Amino acid sequence: MKKYRKISIGCFAMATQTSHVFHGQENMFLENHCIRRNTGRDSKKPLKQKNMNGLGQNSDNGLLVTHVNQTQDLLRLQGSETQSSDWEDSEDWLSAHSLKCQKLTLADLISQGTEVLEEGTNVVQKICFSTQIIRHFESKLSDTIEVYQERIQWLTENSKKAFGLIKGARVSILIDVSAISSGPQKEEFQKDLMSLIDEQLSHKEKLFVLSFGTNAGSLWPDPMEVSASTLQELKLWVKTLQPDGGSNLLQALKKIFTLKGLDSLVAIMRSCPDQPSEILSDYIQQSTMGRDLIIHFITYRCDDQMPPAVLKNLAEAVRGYYHCYSPKMEHYTSRDMDELLAEIQKAQSLLSHVQALQHSSPCEALTCTMEEISTEITNGPLISLLPKPPKHDAPLTIEFPNLDKTSAEWLKVNGLKAKKLSLYQVLAPNAFSPVEEFVPILQKTVSSTIHEKAMIQFEWHDGTVKNIHVDPPFLYKYQQQLSRAMRMYERRIEWLSLASRRIWGTVCEKRVVVLLDISATNSMYIIHIQHSLRLLLEEQLSNKDCFNLIAFGSTIESWRPEMVPVSHNNLQSAWRWALNLRCRGSRNVLSALRKAVEVDFKDKDKHQSQGIYLFTGGIPDQDMPTLSAYMAEACGGCDLQLNVCLFYVGEPKMDTTPPARYASHTDTAAAYKEVTRAAGGRFHWFGDTGIYESDDINSIMSEMEKALNYSQKCAFLMASLKNHSGKVLGSSALPKEKPKTLQLRSQPKKLCPPRPTVPLGARMSIKDDPDREKSPPLKSLKWRPLSSRVGISPAAAQPTKEGMMELRRKTKSREAETSLLLFYTEKGNDVGSVYKKYPQGRGLRRTSSSIDLPRKDTVCSSQEWVAKYGLKKLKLEISRCMGPNCTHQKSGQRSASAKHCSIFPSVEIHGVVRHIQWTPREMEVYIRHLEKVLRRYVQRLQWLLSGSRRLFGTVLESKVCILLDTSGSMGPYLQQVKTELVLLIWEQLRKCCDSFNLLSFAESFQSWQDTLVETTDAACHEAMQWVTHLQAQGSTSILQALLKAFSFHDLEGLYLLTDGKPDTSCSLVLNEVQKLREKRDVKVHTISLNCSDRAAVEFLRKLASFTGGRYHCPVGEDTLSKIHSLLTKGFINEKDPTLPPFEGDDLRILAQEITKARSFLWQAQSFRSQLQKKNDAEPKVTLS
């Protein structure tokens, strides 16, 4: 235990101090690893170091060593294996070694204990742990902390200390030379850069380096493949770096973003950039939109010139990585380091609880009898173990804010109409309505006309058409004003997205009551609720007149009986009260609203500017129409608004007590929006990823869209003016360019009969064809060989009538755009042609300009979805870019290939040579389409792995029954199944099904209802209550459950969830189901929770196949986390790992299509590179 106590103290020191220095023998293995990497192929030093550290006494691994060279080879092999894992991406490494992945969380410890129930009830009174379990868990925690310490020590060695761990394979390096000075500092900087090149950059695929100061200069024009020569050239270039004025980072970024093929950007900064961080952040985000680019910001020796927090904030804004290094204080921080430290703090906190638990009783069976722990375990997670922000319990740091306004009020002063920037306001002086009057002399109505198109007709806001005099300089000035207004609106949106406004929006009223949701479903988020309230008290409430806080669950708890004036003491008192809040009960929103309206705002008619801010995370206990009616009546006739701040906390967890009401996050948001509309307030919805919806931001966005619309109409006016000018100029030149002879030759009857040189059939096929004007261009019907050596007779090559018809069918798609005039020349044998309508460009002749894919996921099987949006249906097979098999090499009549064998690149596929018939542009379009389709496939796969679909799959039918196995073997899975079943009821059955029923089976079956029940809210709540009482016991009688389910009237689909085979014969079950299927067309979809039992899996597959259903096997947590990591990183590059094999039908079919799309994408990228190489190799023709 002393060892564990020592490690715990060491972790605390590391987490609280700024200098991360570790000592001891536990890091020797990583030191050996780094020494091996730095010494390259020198195997003597690693061997010597290993013996010195005492790590050479490893047990024999079965390999007999007979020579010293073999020992060195084994050590080198071992070093390479450990090197690959150590140099793994930090996120991947941490996900594989996290406490959750190693099952070292508090929930994992509690699951190993034995529950002791209170007599006569199902309430957990105690949880018992054996000494062996406690010691084993403590030992694993200590070992994990040591691994984290070793990882941190490794991250602070060699080049990683100064520059961090460089991610990516194709890296661009930006080096700030503004602060380079001669002397020891310059030599040390060059030395560190040399270490970075040798240790990390030498293992990359491509490199591009650029130095910048006032100006930017690169070593190479394009990214270079990493080789010994390029690395040597890079080292020589580093030695020549000289200081260059300022630090123009923006100019360097502009040069980098023009390059293609890079996946990592590293900026090594030595001083503060010339541009503000807001401008750099916006530019980086816009330039990297749609690109998978890893961004690193590294601060090197910039203590005096720039605080490291500047670039750290910039890196966080663009979701990149940061690394700060200060050799004076030996201080280095990075995102990788911070994540490791956070994990160590969690491990150390948990270790202290485990140690306290072990010392609480000396007996063999330790019993947790402390009331606090047992109560918190019963109610939810331990609050003391939840992560807290820095200085969470400290007193408030109160600021005095400005007088904020809602966006609607702000736009009354800064909107386009208020600034007189409405397009119709601007154009009104130069807009004239068309005049139309009746002329008595002419006895008809005469309309005014515009002289020589001097004005442009333009649709006005009321639907009428006006004549506009277009003044280009005036419109240019107006466009500049619109641009300034757009920038102002962007700054407003950015301001609304920062600090407490990101959570609460703008609190503008002078009298405020805040309602806090502390229901049991928010137990995991109590720290978040408290921190959000802290930000509000510090930043937005100090300039108010009165305020109060009300917390509500099943009951309400108020900080003060009524509103009190805002003061420093009252704000601090309110914060201390909030720190003691605990989550419990349901979500009684109506009681909290009644307390605020009827007590705090009892004299609401006598005051102005009053607001209620409801901070909640889910649907209330009461019906939304009731809340809407109550608030509409309460807010009517007075200046009182209800503003809702909704935070998304995920789906509610299943507990012994289900929530009073359930709704998805989208339905919850829609319900609260109705309440805010009825109460004249504002709606604000946010989550951990940002703001989802905000009325304040929507108002600004609407004004920006209006400005954009005005700008587009200005561009339309300018384009119309240019078109009119072009028409006037071109009208006089057009008759001169159009010869009259072309119109005469278009008449077939005036053609002179030529000499009978060409076969009659070919000539008559042209003469008698009434649509020959739409024929493709033919220069002559004379046959010409493809090469100089030809053994085919000219007669065989003459076009026949069938050949001409086939040619027209192939060009039918271009007939609408192309119109030709054919005629015979004086030579008689030749046919000439003249375009009457020119053909469109053929750059995309085999690829469509757009791919139609659904934005939202439709409820259907993967087989149906792939049939609609698969690669074959979208015509995206790679074979479409390939020509037929090349037979020119096999010709016996000639030795040379045809001419186009040298023109079109060829590839060998399965031993057959085929030509690539697409141009580089067509191949580029095809690759873009494939990447778009692949992203959509990945989105569909993520949808299938989310929510209740992960366990149950997708429910397709409208009248279904869920069969749930509750036998004794289901005990380990039952709690998870109950949670997912509640989610299934609300997420799929409530939304997509007309009627449903639930049926559990073990030795016998138990149905929720006798028949299918209509899907309503009340029915779903009753089903939830029924699910909570399910218990696992007995055997597995599947046949009886199926017979009962088939008896339900109008049943369309059955969903059978089990973990094994039936107690009876599998063939008997299949035969009985086959007989039932003959009478009723009911599909049975099977779900297996135990994929290791292959016999059970085969039985469930056959059962689903016989009935036309689908087999589904849920993905495990470990596999799911790996898949999520793959899908979020892009999953497009060839080096990315493949998807794991899926058992379920829906996942397997979609994964096969994804694999096929990735294969096509890699082949297309290879073909594109061949086409580019061939184009680069062709000699360029210059015109003199």
From Swiss-Prot:
Residues 765-776 have a biased composition (Basic and acidic residues). It comes from the Eukaryota. Gene3D superfamilies: von Willebrand factor, type A domain (3.40.50.410). Residues 50-62 have a biased composition (Polar residues). Residues 40-62, 729-780 are annotated as: Disordered. Pfam families: VWA_3. Keywords: Coiled coil, Glycoprotein, Repeat, Secreted, Signal. Residues 1-24 form the signal peptide. Residues 511-708, 959-1131 form the VWFA domain. This is von Willebrand factor A domain-containing protein 3A. The lineage of its organism: Eukaryota, Metazoa, Chordata, Craniata, Vertebrata. It is found in: Secreted. It comes from Homo sapiens. One of its GO terms (cellular component) is extracellular region.
